[in-house]
Amino acid sequence: MSRPRRRGRDVHGVLLLDKPQGLSSNDALQKVKRIYNANRAGHTGALDPLATGMLPICLGEATKFSQYLLDSDKRYRVIARLGQRTDTSDADGTVVEERPVTFSEQQLQDALESFRGDTLQVPTMFSALKYQGKPLYEYARQGIEVPREARPITVYELLFIRHEGDELELEVHCSKGTYIRTIIDDLGEKLGCGAHVIYLRRLTVSKYPVERMVTLEQLNALLEEAQTRDIAPSELLDPLLMPMDSPAADYPVVNLPLTSSVYFKNGNPVRTTGAPSEGLVRVTEGEAQKFLGMGEIDSEGRVAPRRLVVEYPV
């Protein structure tokens, strides 16, 4: 007889986790889900186990809007080891080639310049992108290389921080879908010495404030404090959450009057003033501007529902 499924609570929002090194993004997600006793949870844009930094964890209804964070810009600090190339392009892999580091500082600056702006990037085999339904890393672990299409990316900023011996430190502000490991591997090839990532930290995702990041240690400490004070953990944990609509913060807002919002919530497109002429919009209602979900301007200029919040009783 199967054990009845444990019922969590309906908690909605985005936690900005400072993911520790050595933990997979999914393991970090499960820890946060347990700490919050949440019914649903999902992360937006995995970080490698080697990487640390901002990992937005969406809880409850916020999971419906996590896809919009996948499209956002990100900023990283990375340290590369020069002179060694690995099969995964980071320190978790096996060294497959060693070469002397002989480039000049001018050659380094010229190489860095070639990565700035709009470029095409061939994703690493050690990635979660899928080929014929399977993640690329599953093929890579079997020693199989499959064709990958080059994808357009944008590197808005590539800042040189330091070059000391066989270490090179950079800061990268980039578009969605950019693999920092691939940038470092490609840079190593351009410099003729090979390179791989030994340190990677995601500094920011979209416009989320860095000061709102929290660690697993801080979350567990709050759990202990709640137990000591004999209060519900939610009293200490829930104030850490960003609003459930924050993943879609970059989209324009359309506020519907209560007379129109009832139709919108029932799945019908509605006409309203002040809406853009096209594209996705964040829809709110009334004076309180309560978030209803995402809409899209249809061919008749109406706001059509695309993804709505389920209204839970308080």
Swiss-Prot record:
Enzyme class per UniProt: isomerase
Residues annotated to bind substrate: 43, 76, 179, 200
Gene3D superfamilies reported for this sequence: Pseudouridine synthase, PUA domain
Positions annotated as active site in the UniProt record: 48 (nucleophile)
SUPFAM superfamilies: Pseudouridine synthase, PUA domain-like
Reactions catalysed, as given in the entry: uridine(55) in tRNA = pseudouridine(55) in tRNA
Highest taxon listed in the record's lineage: Bacteria
Underlying gene: truB
GO MF entry, a single one: tRNA pseudouridine(55) synthase activity
Gene Ontology annotations of biological process type: mRNA pseudouridine synthesis; tRNA pseudouridine synthesis
InterPro entries tied to this protein: PsdUridine_synth_cat_dom_sf (IPR020103), PsdUridine_synth_N (IPR002501), PUA-like_sf (IPR015947), PUA_sf (IPR036974), tRNA_psdUridine_synth_TruB (IPR014780), tRNA_sdUridine_synth_fam1_C (IPR015240), TruB_C (IPR032819)
HAMAP family, per the entry: TruB_bact (MF_01080)
Keyword Calcium recorded: no
Coiled coil location: none
Protein name per Swiss-Prot or TrEMBL: tRNA pseudouridine synthase B
EC number: 5.4.99.25
Protein family: Belongs to the pseudouridine synthase TruB family. Type 1 subfamily.
Keywords: Isomerase, tRNA processing
